[in-house]
Amino acid sequence: RLVQEGLAHAFFIGPNQKHHALLLRLQAEAQQHKVGIWSARGRVRDLKITTAHPADPTQDDQYPSYVRIANLSNATIKLAGYVLSNEGGQRCLFPDVSMDPGYTVIASSGSGTDGVAAKGQLVVHCSELAWDPSEDTAFLTNPSRSLVDTFHYKGKRVRGPSSRYKGKAR
């Protein structure tokens, strides 16, 4: 009901696709009718930075910093050529990976193999990106170098209620 009324967007993690078609159809209808978050007051984007999780310098943080980006469109988006950067000018060029509608990609500051992790989460490793633990801004640009979205955080880690990466959130 929330998706239908434009109060939420479709969001999927993992392989279970039981309700994907229904939720994407309801989202498309809400977008078409310009209700809720899809209204004229909002700036509709296909890709949105939803979470920033900088490392915590006061703890032995076993998980690397990351930024989560959601596909709010109703189509698969190829991320090849997109760039995620920060205020310090560090950049991460996305490889040739695709993100299905309603899914997210984790841009992790750790190292590893890019692709879908065991629990169905798409992960891209950007070891050249270091996020300032106190304040920073994430910038996402498309292959044409147009700004797609920004996400500024200040203070402690910024995350939504379901923004967890590898294990328990602190």
Q: Model features per residue range: what roles?
A:
Residues 1-170:
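Small beta-barrel nucleic-acid-binding modules, primarily SNase/OB-fold domains
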